[in-house]
């Protein structure tokens, strides 16, 4: 089964949302230098239609004494911004995270954003779209996504951002919150990063031809969840004017659940109390300064050494970023309403991304005595479809339908929903993509971008580029 899983991942890379996409070589373009509060940045281009500005810092690196604190403003207007080799936030490497390497990759110095706009954008005032990547709030990077086609075809300025992930982005501990003041008392540092990126966008996007009074936030999976978090967060008031949540969910935990002392809540795994135990530290008495001095990869190693059979507490109803009543209830409360148009939806076959990896449902038959990858097939088509339909509808019921009903209760007037259906992928002798995956979790992203993802495999999956528009 171990071999089968690895092979299946390779065969289904087009549907693993957080896998890098190919881009043409970028070259500096004269006359595209833009001044920002973070420094001056020169645009680059792979074609004549759009300009990219890459790796712009929107906050100070959250490392050292700034680990597990609210993002701090970064100002260097006279500096020259250079594209970096990597801006990935620390995470576990692998196909799903779209990162290469062994064990863990990335740096705490990762709070950067990219901007892509039509070549003539700076002579106009165009709508702005800010993309929040998915990945369970534990993986992912802005670098995965190329919104060039969306920017050009729809004449919009697109911003893609990084934010802290996993235990670096979400933690609840008596010393961290107990010794802090103001926003530093939050448990939701990843979402504070997103808010900081939106604040930077408000102050600077007009220099790129964007309209700071016409900002749409959009995100998929955990990105959609974070869109909901922004809809209920008082800290995000006035930072956006429309919201799109793709395959979102509304799960939050209380601070007590996030700490989970002595595994008081056995249905939750990888709480902060467990993390400190894995680090061989006293979960109740270790100081915040001691925690901030630990090597970041040691923290990640301890975090991923913990079993994960249940939900991991991440987004926390801390009463600062997310109201203390929790996300789902806050969505229905008029006092948190942003009164903006909201579009939310899910995919017909959300859960095939995970069920297609489950040997209970899928065979991996050896080919040529194991010399070729296994041929994947569903064991029982009727049973497979039953569970796919049931669980995908459950995702929609809670993540979309209930959330939108709650927004209606809060007084939102312009609410829209969708369901994404697709089973027109190219067939492979090794796997029937339409029947095994169909409209899987994340399958819509290439259509939103307006171009195939995932390099050569994506070109195979989308033989006609226009099919992803």
Where do the protein language model's features map onto the residues?
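Alpha/beta-hydrolase fold nucleophile elbow
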Residues: 209-220
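Substrate-access "cap/lid" subdomains that shape
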Residues: 98-99, 196, 203, 229-232, ...
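A short, hydrophobic beta-strand element of the alpha/beta-hydrolase
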Residues: 217, 244-246
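Alpha/beta-hydrolase active-site loop
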Residues: 110, 183-206, 265-270
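Non-catalytic accessory segments of hydrolases
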Residues: 2, 22-188, 458-469
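Glycine-rich nucleophile elbow surrounding the catalytic serine of serine-hydrolase chemistry
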Residues: 219-229
């Amino acid at each position: 089964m171990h071999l089968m899983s690895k092979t299946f991942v390779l065969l289904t890379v087009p549907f693993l949302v957080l896998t890098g996409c190919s881009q043409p070589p970028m070259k500096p373009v004269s006359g595209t230098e833009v001044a920002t509060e973070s420094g001056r940045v020169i645009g680059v281009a792979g074609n004549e239609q759009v300009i990219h500005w890459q790796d712009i810092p929107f906050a100070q690196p959250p490392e050292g004494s700034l680990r597990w604190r609210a993002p701090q403003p970064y100002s260097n207007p006279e500096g020259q911004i250079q594209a970096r080799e990597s801006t990935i936030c620390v995470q576990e490497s692998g196909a799903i995270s779209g990162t290469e390497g062994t064990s863990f990759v990335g740096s705490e110095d990762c709070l950067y954003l990219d901007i892509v706009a039509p070549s003539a954008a700076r002579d106009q005032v165009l709508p702005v779209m800010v993309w929040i990547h998915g990945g369970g709030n534990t993986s992912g990077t802005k670098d995965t996504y190329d919104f060039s086609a969306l920017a050009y075809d729809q004449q919009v300025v697109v911003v893609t951002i990084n934010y802290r992930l996993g235990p670096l982005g979400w933690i609840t501990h008596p010393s961290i919150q107990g010794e802090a003041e103001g926003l530093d008392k939050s448990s939701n540092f990843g979402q504070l990063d997103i808010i900081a990126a939106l604040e930077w966008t408000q102050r600077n996007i007009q220099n790129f031809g964007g309209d700071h009074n016409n900002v749409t936030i959009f995100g998929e999976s955990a990105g959609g969840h974070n869109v909901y978090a922004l809809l209920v967060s008082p800290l995000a008031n006035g930072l956006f004017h429309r919201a799109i949540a793709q395959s979102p969910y509304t799960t939050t935990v209380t601070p007590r659940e996030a700490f989970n002392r002595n595994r008081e809540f056995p249905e939750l795994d990888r709480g902060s109390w467990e993390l400190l135990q894995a680090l061989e530290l006293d979960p109740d008495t270790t100081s915040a300064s001691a925690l901030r001095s630990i090597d970041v990869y040691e923290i990640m190693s301890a975090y991923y050494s913990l079993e994960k059979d249940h939900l991991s507490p991440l987004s926390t109803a801390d009463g600062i970023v997310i109201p203390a009543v929790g996300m789902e209830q806050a969505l229905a409360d008029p006092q948190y309403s942003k009164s903006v148009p909201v579009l939310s939806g899910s995919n017909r076959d959300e859960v095939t991304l995970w069920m297609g990896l489950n040997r209970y449902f899928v065979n991996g038959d050896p080919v040529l005595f194991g010399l070729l990858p296994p041929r994947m097939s569903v064991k029982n088509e009727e049973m497979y479809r039953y569970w796919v339909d049931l669980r995908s509808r459950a995702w929609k019921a809670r993540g979309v339908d209930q959330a939108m009903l709650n927004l209606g209760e809060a007084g939102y007037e312009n609410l829209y929903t969708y369901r994404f259906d697709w089973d027109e992928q190219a067939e492979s002798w090794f796997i029937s993509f339409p029947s095994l995956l169909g409209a899987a979790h994340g399958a819509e992203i290439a259509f939103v971008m307006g171009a195939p993802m995932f390099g050569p495999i994506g070109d195979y999956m989308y033989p006609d580029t226009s099919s992803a528009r």
